[in-house]
């Protein structure tokens, strides 16, 4: 199990460095970097399935620790997957807006009688602004949805990790005071997560109200 764990952990660290390279990539290479990162993430998920099987076969005194290490890797790669999806969503919206802006700037109206062209007037510019506002709202909603999905995935992972920590605490014979502190911290983390979700929704609502 250990060689596969070390290999997978190294891949996670490499993806973290590639995410920084993704932010600096130009339009010609950004798709290649995205595909490279996605392929690595899929390979890591495959390794994690194998590691979960191997961790369940570890000796009893090492099994819980092995599962915790696998859960930490799973949490890290889920976070990276969410970050990649958010980046792709922002890039796609930005590229779509650029295409629409170029189309609007190059669009002219031609009369039936001659080749005379009529430049874009204020009404068309106003419609263009409304169109961009609608796409901006879609971008906010899509980004908020991605954030909420990421929080849900992290909550499930943390919930499983908390249960394993409590199991280890019982095995090691930790005091009830220590276990209560662990449960209190998990309870506080839950409210922090809910507060973050409510704050995100409030910001999205205020931005939509401002834009409309």
From Swiss-Prot:
Residues 212 are vesicular. Residues 60-92 form a coiled coil. It is found in: Golgi apparatus, cis-Golgi network membrane; Golgi apparatus membrane; Endoplasmic reticulum membrane. Keywords: Acetylation, Coiled coil, Endoplasmic reticulum, Golgi apparatus, Membrane, Protein transport, Transmembrane, Transmembrane helix, Transport. Residues 1-190 are cytoplasmic. GO terms for biological process: intra-Golgi vesicle-mediated transport; protein transport; vesicle-mediated transport. Pfam families: V-SNARE_C. This is Golgi SNAP receptor complex member 2.
């Amino acid at each position: 199990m250990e060689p596969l764990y070390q290999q997978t952990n190294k891949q996670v660290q490499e993806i973290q460095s590639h995410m920084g390279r993704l932010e600096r990539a130009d339009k010609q290479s950004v798709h290649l970097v995205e595909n490279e990162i996605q392929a690595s993430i899929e390979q890591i998920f495959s390794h994690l399935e194998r590691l979960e099987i191997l961790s369940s076969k570890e000796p009893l005194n090492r099994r819980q620790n092995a599962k915790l290490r696998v859960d930490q890797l799973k949490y890290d790669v889920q976070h990276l997957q969410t970050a990649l999806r958010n980046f792709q969503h922002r890039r796609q919206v930005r590229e779509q807006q650029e295409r629409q802006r170029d189309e609007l700037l190059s669009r002219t109206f031609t009369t039936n009688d001659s080749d005379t062209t009529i430049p874009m007037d204020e009404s068309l510019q106003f419609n263009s602004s409304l169109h961009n506002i609608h796409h901006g709202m879609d971008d906010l909603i899509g980004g908020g949805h991605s954030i909420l999905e990421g929080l849900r995935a992290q909550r499930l992972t943390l919930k499983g990790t908390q249960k394993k920590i409590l199991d280890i605490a019982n095995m090691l014979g930790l005091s009830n005071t220590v276990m209560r502190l662990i449960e209190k911290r998990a309870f506080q983390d839950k409210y922090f997560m809910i507060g973050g979700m409510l704050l995100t929704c409030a910001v999205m609502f205020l931005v939509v109200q401002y834009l409309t």
